[in-house]
Amino acid sequence: MDAKTKIDILINSAGITGSTTELWNYDYEEWKKIIDINLHGTFNCCKSVVPHMIKNNYGRIVNIASVSGKDGNAKASAYSSSKAGVIALTKSLGKELADKNIAVNAVTPAGAKTRILDQMSKEHVQRMLSKVPRARFLELEELTSMVCWLSSTENSFSTAAVFDISGGRSTY
């Protein structure tokens, strides 16, 4: 990006789950890959875009974390850890940019029927679904509605916040 680049909105949504296994069985290289994509990827995108937002005195950043980052999931320690890191990054960066008209928020969705489920065992997917009181997966339209509001001018106050969209799985 050059100095003339104007960026108003950044949505960080890349993510991988990795193996469905206990922490002590994780291959270190796979662990690093999950952290690199999910957490370091969010960091790198924010680091690249924030200076342009500061220059323009405006911006909206929405980080897609996960309910796993709040609650943790058995046999998903790397994914859960990476998304917990995204939540902490969101809170810190949101506070750093609060006086610059830049809102930084995260959403913590429960499972949705996307290709990420293909990375998980059927048993793990069923275990995830069993934790959701709504007894269904998140519809992508539900998530995009929340993300659109968070990235709009209508959201002029909320920053450094985490918005739950877990069908009742998380209560905080």
Go through each PLM region and give its residues:
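C-terminal helical subdomain
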Residues: 106, 127-158, 165-167
